[in-house]
């Protein structure tokens, strides 16, 4: 395993633990007298004005639209690296986690729709349980230390990266509403400039960031979710240049600690603070939270494990070396930790306008993700040999 992947896994695992702490603090603040401070912080008005261009949003939306674009930039860099020279490079390496990820997105969505398909409003949240929080999942896996084989860590990493790619496609296709053609035109021109820079082998990441900022503003104004700008920029930055170190790997190395230790924990803090005031047992057992929790805890392992088993039995793919189906099942349960990614999709599906839907969708995510984390940890602990 390369040094960059080792470092990635260490940072994701440590970041996952900080993420959990941030979410717990948010839940405590949202349900104590500190809730006033918590909500005042999230609603803090922030305005950026350059000439006639003005963007004014509360801090919560700057976190969700701005900082999360940086997260998706790192995702774009990771996916490109893994596709070209990492754990997804070549058909043999990519097929098994790709098929597993496909099952892990289809089954949770179908289970969610079994509960919510008849309701026109809640049906929009079908993609909520399709996501996996890689930082949280790796954080739980890290609790078992060196008992976890490298091949299993790389499998989870590859699976989660493909899952992220699927989520990006879902956001672009299904969670984009009113579109401004003028802003899309500026976005298209920005992408063309980035593509030309990549083709010419421009290695200065600062130039990509300048054009990328224009792209982010254009996509934000277009009605398409602004985080997609991050993915596009990540794919456009070259992995290799004729002289000097890799621009893509250098930028990923610089940004990853900020994402793991600041951006994702801040996102969790800003979005996990669900007030339990007014929450009832009947509401908690209603179709929305039950569908989300079932999609995460039942749908994820069902889809990942079934598709993995079929792929191997049909000869389409083979198990990675050093991994058995017991470990695959344990990892498939861990992938039911949707947390930040599921909360992100819930915010796109329901927004913050409907407090009831927002509250119960987040509670469903927290229940499903927590159950998946506890059970997944237990199964993984039982399936791995003890290190003496």
Curated annotation (Swiss-Prot):
Catalytic activity: Na(+)(in) + 2 H(+)(out) = Na(+)(out) + 2 H(+)(in)
Membrane topology (UniProt): Multi-pass membrane protein
Keyword GTP-binding found: no
Residue spans crossing the bilayer: 13-33, 36-56, 59-79, 95-115, 125-145, 154-174, 179-199, 213-233, 259-279, 287-307, 328-348, 363-383
Matching Pfam families: Na_H_antiport_1
Cellular component annotations (GO), alphabetically ordered: plasma membrane
Family: Belongs to the NhaA Na(+)/H(+) (TC 2.A.33) antiporter family.
HAMAP family in alphabetical order: NhaA
Protein name: Na(+)/H(+) antiporter NhaA
Source species of the chain: Serratia proteamaculans (strain 568)
Lineage, uppermost ranks: Bacteria, Pseudomonadati, Pseudomonadota, Gammaproteobacteria, Enterobacterales
Designated gene of the protein: nhaA
